[in-house]
């Protein structure tokens, strides 16, 4: 989702970002149901920007209440992940990296060619949101993904991206 730009503040962490050590290649970061090309210019080596709602930076006190729960990508959330809700545009929030762990990604474990092909289909679908060809690409992705089963959104213990994004938000 997106909020109007005048209601947001842009922060650029650059090389100080926790994402920097895993930012070796261009265009590797992903989130769910968004065109990855948009994120490629925002989250890349040496840049790493976040767009947050202006309101929390204009108040005297913020109450951030922890809720102890598990999260598929971040593990335990406590109060750290609460700040994800301050986001002004989801394209600024990397949730995983493309590819399996054997290829330097963290979308899934190991090297799984059918999952990689399914990821390509998801990327193609996300470039066609709102068009009739979207459903064709999503169906192809689902069929390919069934070969190995599981998920294509980095929902496993080896996700090394989400915790870094959450920690960056808490450092702003």
State what each model feature region is:
Residues 1-172:
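Extended, low-polarity segments enriched in aliphatic/aromatic residues
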């Amino acid at each position: 989702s997106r909020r109007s730009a005048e209601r947001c503040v842009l922060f650029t962490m650059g090389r100080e970002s926790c994402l920097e050590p895993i930012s070796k290649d261009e265009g590797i970061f992903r989130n769910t149901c968004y065109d990855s090309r948009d994120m490629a210019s925002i989250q890349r080596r040496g840049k790493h920007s976040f767009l947050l709602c202006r309101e929390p930076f204009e108040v005297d006190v913020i109450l951030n209440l922890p809720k102890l729960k598990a999260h598929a990508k971040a593990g335990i959330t406590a109060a750290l992940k609460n700040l994800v809700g301050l986001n002004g545009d989801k394209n600024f929030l990397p949730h995983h990296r493309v590819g399996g762990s054997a290829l330097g990604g963290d979308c899934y474990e190991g090297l799984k060619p059918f999952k990689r092909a399914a990821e390509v289909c998801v990327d193609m679908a996300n470039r066609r949101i709102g068009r009739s060809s979207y459903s064709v690409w999503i169906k192809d992705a689902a069929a390919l993904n069934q070969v190995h089963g599981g998920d294509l959104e980095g929902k496993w213990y080896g996700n090394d991206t989400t915790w870094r994004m959450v920690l960056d938000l808490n450092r702003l």
